[in-house]
Amino acid sequence: MSYEFILGGENTPRIKLYIACSLDGYIAREDGSIDWLTEYDNNPETDYGYSEFYASISTVLMGRKTYEQVLGFGDWPYAEKKTYVFTGQKEPLLREKNVEFVSGNVGEFTRQLKENTDKDIWLVGGSQLIRAFLEEDLVDDMIVFIVPIILGGGIPLFDRIGKEIKLKMTNTERYKSGLLRMEYNLKPT
């Protein structure tokens, strides 16, 4: 399968997983709910580096379930970014501005995307897509926010990846809210 892209970039963008999880490693409750995160929404005190991160990316990648979850929040928050939704279905729910649905080989698509994009790429999630990206060695950096809550169950951040992955910690930051930001490289820059 071949994919066509509009942009032609000179820099090699990095794929960055930017995500929050509970202390026990869950990104959502069993039903997909992330209500436990609302206490930590961006506020006037801090946006936890989100604005800077968001400005550094041109592309958003997510799975179908994550897409449907984000649609439930109201206005589409990524309208000015090109978004690719990985799905095995023909056409999930609604198509928002700048959204394209993708099926097929994750690795092949993503490698072609990186060759034709000039800014970094945000891997939003969910768990199944994160696993596929890690299995194919496609993630370059992880920015993980540990939220001070134990959910006791739910959708895990890392679900049976099937291999060991060594990380290099590049930065940590602790916020007054109790959140801990940890940054890792999976591949050398």
Q: Each predicted region: which residue ranges?
A:
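Enzymes that bind and transform nitrogen-containing heteroaromatic metabolites
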Residues: 2-189
